[in-house]
Amino acid sequence: MTESAGVKQLVGVADITENRNIWRMLVAEFLGTFFLVSIGIGSTMGWGGDYAPTMTQIAFTFGLVVATLAQAFGHVSGCHINPAVTIGLMITADISILKGAFYIVSQCVGAIAGAALIKAATPSDVIGGLGVTGIDPRLTAGQGVMIEALITFILVFVVHGVCDNRRSDIKGSAPLAIGLSITAGHLSAIKYTGASMNPARSFGPAVVMGNWTDQWVYWVGPIVGGILAGAVYRLFFKVRKGDEESYDF
């Protein structure tokens, strides 16, 4: 393989120019993130009274919608619907750089559309902050980054574990495992940072509301967590040829 061919393979030019399904994949990422953000932030709207949102309700809404979408779109694009997941999969060479970049753009546009729909469909006195994620005022931005990196690490690590194509021991539902990791992250960290775990999820409402406070935290934290999860899984835990398929209990 020539140096030029090697660079093209790493970047993934053929994934864009020769893959007939690339547009289906990008539309799937757009729609998946659209539904994630619209359904997810819909659960945070401040209706008040008996319909006031609770932490448990929000946590399970985000977890269940991701599990559902993974079943619906997983066979088309892998249903990343999260730049941190996409970047984590870049680290393990499961997706090329160029294809990953196109995925991330589709995810961000879908997130904006999802947030815009909820704003348009919700009474103005209920919208509140439109689910814009924010750091507890008692925390520093650095602490917010650490929390977001932590909970996103768990999410992306689970994605790698259940999507490892050399494993043959997975007996449960991979989408459910991913969804529950998101629910767990929310239950743990909503009070800290709003538990974004997903730059696109924070980006969409921020664009629609024009609220950029600490937005960088919701990019740096999840991306760092995704990169670390991808690197750790690839270095220490990815099933390789000749390895035992699973731990023998």
UniProtKB/Swiss-Prot annotation:
Positions in the Cytoplasmic compartment: 1-26, 79-100, 160-169, 233-249
TM region positions: 27-47, 58-78, 101-121, 139-159, 170-190, 212-232
Motif (NPA 1): 82-84
UniProt keyword Repeat, yes or no: yes
Protein function: Forms a water-specific channel.
PANTHER family: AQUAPORIN, AQUAPORIN TRANSPORTER
Comment on protein domains: Aquaporins contain two tandem repeats each containing three membrane-spanning domains and a pore-forming loop with the signature motif Asn-Pro-Ala (NPA).
Name of this chain's protein: Aquaporin AQPAe.a
Lineage of source species: Eukaryota, Metazoa, Ecdysozoa, Arthropoda, Hexapoda
